[in-house]
Regions:
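Accessible peptide chain termini
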Residues: 1-2, 34
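Intrinsic-disorder-associated, low-complexity terminal segments enriched in Asp/Asn/His/Tyr and depleted
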Residues: 2-4, 24
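Short terminal hydrophobic/aromatic SLiMs and anchors at protein ends
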Residues: 10, 17-19
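A solvent-exposed interaction/effector surface
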Residues: 28-236
């Protein structure tokens, strides 16, 4: 699935949001030793996988900021609004937590992708795609903190996507692999997963196609982009 242009827009939206929110506040003396939670390190297994080789992983329930949409992400204004809403709210939550003594690193963007017809992906009929873009947050973020951050973000941006929410994602047993290269080159790896690995292992689909975008497309050549591909499964 070719989403390189989308990833570029992700980077641009991130910069716009950071400018809208303002810089990370200057550290006060008591903040110098404040521990900063990095979920990529704390939950390392979720962000790592063998290159081009799917392995089973049990994914625990995880808290995410989420936003939904439908259609071609490269053309849909809704997609850019979703990203702006997610990043603005994620940074708003982060700064609020930091002011109370609990800082964290904003996690990489993730996406859930689906379509009524799986061939929509291989045929690149992007107008048929359904997507949910997500940013993982610490599990101590509650609904009240989210709603407060949402209000602040809306004041900054003027408008947020209506589907923005805090939700727990439960995937359970998954198969996960690392793809290095252009998003357009994921096809053969996905075909092997769907046509060989899952049938031979007695697995059926247990959830939506899940991608975790580890690379910064502004600084990374397309052939070196790192994407974790995750597929929730169930035993048939």
């Amino acid at each position: 699935m070719d989403r390189y242009l989308e990833a570029v827009s992700i980077a641009l939206v991130t910069e716009i949001v950071k400018r809208a929110i303002g810089p990370d506040p200057v550290k006060r003396p008591w903040e110098q030793q404040m521990e900063k939670l990095d979920l990529k390190k704390a939950r390392k297994a979720l962000f790592n996988a063998p290159l081009n080789r799917f392995v089973p992983i049990e994914v625990p329930p995880l808290a995410y900021l989420m936003a939904d949409g439908q259609g071609d992400p490269n053309a849909a204004p809704e997609y850019k609004l979703a990203l702006a809403s997610l990043y603005a709210t994620a940074y708003s939550v982060k700064f609020a937590c930091k002011a109370k003594g609990r800082d964290f690193v904003v996690s990489p963007l993730e996406g859930l992708w689906s379509a009524p017809d799986p061939e929509s992906f291989t045929a690149r009929r992007k107008d048929e795609w359904d997507w949910t873009m997500m940013i993982m947050v610490p599990d101590y973020i509650d609904e009240e903190m989210f709603l407060e951050a949402k209000v602040r973000s809306e004041c900054k941006l003027g408008k947020l996507i209506a589907s923005l929410r805090l939700e727990t994602l439960e995937e359970g047993l998954c198969l996960q692999a690392l793809h290095v290269g252009s998003y357009d080159d994921e096809g053969p790896l996905l075909a092997k997963l769907h046509d060989e690995i899952m049938p031979e292992g007695g697995y059926g689909f247990g959830g939506r196609h899940h991608e975790i975008y580890l690379s910064d497309p502004r600084k990374t050549p397309a052939e070196k982009l790192r994407t974790v591909i995750r597929q929730p499964v169930r035993k048939t």
